[in-house]
Amino acid sequence: DLVVTGTTTELDKTVIEQLVGPLEHILRNSVDHGIEAPSVRAGRGKAPRGRITFHSSVESTQVVVRIRDDGGGIDTARVRQAAVQRGLISEAEAASLNDKESYQLMFRPGFSTAESVTEISGRGVGLDIVQSTVRGLNGSVSVDSQVGEGTEFHIRLPISLAITRVLMVEANQETFAIPLVAVNQVARVA
């Protein structure tokens, strides 16, 4: 099941166009790598169908997008092992990483835990592309996970990239856009 909330959050069209690929990649990964088979879910006391939640909101000075699945969570030992096998880090480095640091390995170019390419997520676009796209928008991407509970990706973008409602004012043959949040009163001066 896909649950979408926060549909009134506004972003500039060009930003949305740049985020389509990264968001699609995270959603595909949630389906392919996150959600367990119905039999595994039943053994864990979960509903047979997985749930992915897509939520967007404005928090302080940021637009935040959260994509959460109720799947199996991230096996950090497997992540570290895959990074060592692909030559991204040494075994000594892998042994010293905590869970948060292990999650960051997933954003390195060339990283994958997949043994084979799949129809769902194996398109050759990794989380490194997700991260570079979001960073190119002056944002950040992070991940939290609990084994057996699920995984949540957080994308944070500066609100300056969001659509801001403004009052257009013309004075002395110059046009100004004043954010409505800064307007207390409007009066015509003759």
Language model features: what each stretch is:
Residues L2-T5:
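Conserved transmitter core of two-component histidine kinases
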Residues S132-A190:
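Conserved secondary-structure micro-motifs at functional edges
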Residues I16-R28:
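Short acidic amphipathic alpha-helix that forms the conserved interface helix of the HATPase_c
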Residues I26, M106, I120, Q173:
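Residue-level signature of catalytic and energy-coupling elements of molecular machines
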Residues T9, K13, R28-K100, V147-G148:
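ATP-lid-like helix-loop hinge signature
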Residues M106, G126, V130:
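Short alpha-helical Gxxx[C/S/T] motif in the catalytic ATP-binding
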Residues R123:
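Flexible nucleotide-binding loop
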Residues S90-A95, S112-E119:
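Activation segment
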